[in-house]
């Protein structure tokens, strides 16, 4: 009996040791995971905040929302996540009741503000793409500030009720932090989900849905990479008659002009899917978990699922600087330039200022229905020349585009695509008669813009010459002929009282003749004399 009892005791002790060892391994793994998430959240959002703050030309109206988003995520990594790391090891809250309530409020406030900011960014892109002409009047600096203030007030309204009796705050050992007791007040759980999560998600769905529809209309393609243009004989019909069909074999040389690869539509679709997918993947499980706790009790959700859902909600703060910050080519180049100096390409200051001004109308997505010249004039800049970001395929590429959407415009150009835009190879395509009329009108507008630019250039040159002549005449009247630069007058005199420098006298005579001719508006006559 004693031998059997000792054997059973040894087995129980070994089982307890194995369980403790397994639990200790899980705790260590979870501790390492939450530390990695905290480091990525802190560093990722910090570099975007510093880049936007140091490079003031990047802080456009659209990027102000990104700045607010990344700054709030950085505060989350500093004020909330370190206490989550400590609680993941001890499995208890050791920082007191006051800080428990305050950390729960901070977590709800920052999370709600982040989700609402995503909705505001979607609205900003919606106006930039669908209404580019009225965008500068709709999205102004004051309205952007008002939108940011509204975001935080809206979030505060959704987070304060647990502190005033509607629901309560408690430490959740499986979430490793103090949160609202979702299982105690189903009404507050539903209110917070609708007020702070469902509302911005629906706004994102509607806005990005309209944006993608505009991209499809502008691209005039049904599927990415599988649509071809069929052009019949122009001699029989008298004009081009085009129709679309699905590419199957590609063997008919005269019928098919080639496959048009709608890279812009694919890019728009991928960007929208990434934005919406990141939101649903990171916040969807957490919303399902707290809804299950509110409806069927806290025991209805497994502890591991509760932990993973909380991790994913933290991971959303890692996705935001990647999607809305580092995906921006200009921000990425400036960040690399700050880290590695001149080893990476950085645009000159003047070019950056002009690019930021021209494309401030749509900092995320390039305009769809406007030519580069009209975009430049609408933004208050100069008409774009051959260095425009529109290539021969009609793709509008902007380095200031945060998500780098390239959307097809209604026209094509014979110029070579710029080196900084990666556009598909040049392919011929047929157009309808109505499209030809639109292209002719657009070409006429562009030619008028070029003529006006040449006129302005000539007027500027004439004004500069006139100003120099007036300045020279004023110097002659005030200081004499020696004050003019380039007049070679020697100090010695020759018999007769004149100066020995004939070159200087000839220069003065020619300058006076040129001055008189400029005042009379006839420069060529002065040169002939």
UniProtKB/Swiss-Prot annotation:
Q: What CDD domains does UniProt report for this protein, alphabetically?
A: 7tmA_GPR161
Q: What is its main location?
A: membrane
Ranges in coiled-coil conformation: none
Q: Which domain of life is it from?
A: Eukaryota
Cytoplasmic compartment residues: 52-64, 124-143, 212-269, 328-529
Q: Name one GO biological process term.
A: G protein-coupled receptor signaling pathway
Xref: Pfam families: 7tm_1
Give Gene Ontology CC terms: ciliary membrane; cilium; endocytic vesicle membrane; recycling endosome
Transmembrane feature ranges: 31-51, 65-85, 102-123, 144-164, 191-211, 270-290, 307-327
Glycosylation site residues:
4, 15
The disulfide bonds in this chain are 100-178
Matching InterPro entries, A to Z?
GPCR_Rhodpsn, GPCR_Rhodpsn_7TM
* Subcellular compartments: Cell projection, Cilium membrane; Cell membrane
- Recorded topology in the membrane: Multi-pass membrane protein
GO MF terms here are:
G protein-coupled receptor activity
Annotated keywords: Cell membrane, Cell projection, Cilium, Developmental protein, Disulfide bond, G-protein coupled receptor, Glycoprotein, Membrane, Receptor, Transducer, Transmembrane, Transmembrane helix
**Residue ranges that the UniProt entry lists as topological domain Extracellular:** 1-30, 86-101, 165-190, 291-306
Per the entry, what this protein does is:
Key negative regulator of Shh signaling, which promotes the processing of GLI3 into GLI3R during neural tube development. Recruited by TULP3 and the IFT-A complex to primary cilia and acts as a regulator of the PKA-dependent basal repression machinery in Shh signaling by increasing cAMP levels, leading to promote the PKA-dependent processing of GLI3 into GLI3R and repress the Shh signaling. In presence of SHH, it is removed from primary cilia and is internalized into recycling endosomes, preventing its activity and allowing activation of the Shh signaling. Its ligand is unknown.
Q: Per its UniProt record, which disorder involves this protein?
A: Medulloblastoma: Malignant, invasive embryonal tumor of the cerebellum with a preferential manifestation in children.
Q: Family assignment?
A: Belongs to the G-protein coupled receptor 1 family.
Please state what the protein is called: G-protein coupled receptor 161
User: Which organism is the protein's source?
Assistant: Homo sapiens (Human)
Could you read off the lineage of the organism from its UniProt record?
Answer: Eukaryota, Metazoa, Chordata, Craniata, Vertebrata
User: What gene name does this entry carry?
Assistant: GPR161
């Amino acid at each position: 009996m004693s031998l059997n009892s000792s054997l059973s005791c040894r087995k129980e002790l070994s089982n307890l040791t194995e369980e403790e060892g397994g639990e200790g391994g899980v705790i260590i793994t979870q501790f390492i995971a939450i530390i990695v998430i905290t480091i990525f959240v802190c560093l990722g959002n910090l570099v975007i905040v510093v880049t936007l703050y140091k490079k003031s030309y990047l802080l456009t109206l659209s990027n102000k929302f990104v700045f607010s988003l990344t700054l709030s995520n950085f505060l989350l990594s500093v004020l909330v996540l370190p206490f989550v790391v400590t609680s993941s090891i001890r499995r208890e809250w050791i920082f007191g009741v006051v800080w428990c309530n305050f950390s729960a409020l901070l977590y709800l406030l920052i999370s709600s503000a982040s989700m609402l900011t995503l909705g505001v960014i979607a609205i900003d892109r919606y106006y930039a793409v669908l209404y580019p002409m009225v965008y500068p009047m709709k999205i102004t600096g004051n309205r952007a500030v008002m939108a940011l203030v509204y975001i935080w007030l809206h979030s505060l309204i959704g987070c304060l009720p647990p502190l005033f009796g509607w629901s309560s705050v408690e430490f959740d050992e499986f979430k490793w932090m103090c949160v609202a007791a979702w299982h105690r007040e189903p009404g507050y759980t539903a209110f917070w989900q609708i007020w702070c999560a469902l509302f911005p998600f629906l706004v994102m769905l509607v806005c990005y849905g309209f944006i993608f529809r505009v991209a499809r209309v502008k691209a005039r393609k049904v599927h990415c990479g599988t649509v071809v243009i069929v052009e019949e004989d122009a001699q029989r019909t008298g004009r081009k008659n085009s129709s679309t069909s699905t590419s199957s074999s590609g063997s008919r040389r005269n019928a098919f002009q080639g496959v048009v690869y709608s890279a812009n539509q694919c890019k728009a679709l991928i960007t929208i899917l990434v934005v919406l997918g990141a939101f649903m993947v990171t916040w969807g499980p957490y919303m399902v978990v707290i809804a299950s706790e509110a409806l069927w009790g806290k025991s209805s959700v497994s502890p591991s699922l509760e932990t993973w859902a909380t991790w994913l909600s933290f991971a959303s703060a890692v996705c935001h600087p990647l999607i809305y910050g580092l995906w921006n080519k200009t921000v990425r180049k400036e960040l690399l330039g700050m880290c590695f100096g001149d080893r990476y390409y950085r645009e000159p200051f003047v070019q950056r200022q002009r690019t930021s001004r021209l494309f401030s109308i749509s900092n995320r997505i390039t305009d769809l229905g406007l030519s580069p010249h009209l975009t430049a004039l609408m933004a208050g800049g100069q008409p774009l020349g051959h260095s425009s970001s529109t290539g021969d395929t009609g793709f509008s590429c902007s380095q200031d585009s945060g998500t780098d959407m390239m959307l097809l415009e209604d026209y094509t150009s014979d110029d070579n695509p710029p080196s900084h835009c990666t556009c598909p190879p040049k392919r011929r395509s047929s157009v309808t008669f109505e499209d030809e009329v639109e292209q002719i009108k657009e070409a006429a507008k562009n030619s008028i813009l070029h003529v006006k630019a040449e006129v302005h250039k000539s007027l500027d040159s004439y004004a500069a010459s006139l100003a120099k002549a007036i300045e020279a005449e004023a110097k002659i009247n005030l200081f004499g002929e020696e004050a003019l630069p380039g007049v070679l007058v020697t100090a010695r005199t020759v018999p007769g009282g004149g100066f020995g420098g004939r070159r200087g006298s000839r220069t003065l005579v020619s300058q006076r003749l040129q001055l008189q001719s400029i005042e009379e508006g006839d420069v060529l006559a002065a040169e002939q004399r």
